[in-house]
Amino acid sequence: MAYRKLGRDSAHRKAMLREMTTQLIMNERIVTTETRAKEVRKTAEKMITLGKRGDLASRRKAAAFVRNEVADIHEEKDAVVVKSALQKLFSDVAPRYKDRNGGYTRIMKLAVPRKGDAAPMVILELV
C-alpha cells in the first residue's frame, strides 16, 4: 500500500495519524496541511467504515487505532455522562453515514498558506 512519509519515522507517523484521526472523530473538523489531510482522510474513512459494520471485531479494530480520549461530557438527570471517541464513532458518527458508501470526509483548501513555511493549509471535516 502506498503512503506518504510526512518527514517522520514510522512510529511518529503512525502516532500522528492516530491522534489526528481521533481529533477528527471528536471535533468533526480539523485544520492541517494538505498532505497530512490526505493521509488522515484514508484512516478516518476506514474507521467510519468499521463503525458502520458495528460488530465486535470492528469495534476491536477501531479500538486498537482510535485513542481512548474523552469526546463529550454532559449531565443527564443527576448523572454525568462521559463519552469516549470510540463511543462517539460507533453511536454518533457511523450511523450518520449508513446510506453512504465512502466519501465521509471533505477537504476544503484555505486561501492563506501557513505563515512560517507557506505550506498549503486545508480544513478536513466530516461531511
Swiss-Prot record:
One of its GO terms (biological process) is translation. The keyword Secreted does not apply. It holds the Pfam family Ribosomal_L17. One of its GO terms (cellular component) is cytosolic large ribosomal subunit. Transmembrane segments: none annotated. PROSITE patterns: RIBOSOMAL_L17. The keyword Protein biosynthesis does not apply. Keywords: Ribonucleoprotein, Ribosomal protein. GO terms for molecular function: structural constituent of ribosome. Belongs to the bacterial ribosomal protein bL17 family. Part of the 50S ribosomal subunit. Contacts protein L32. This is Large ribosomal subunit protein bL17.
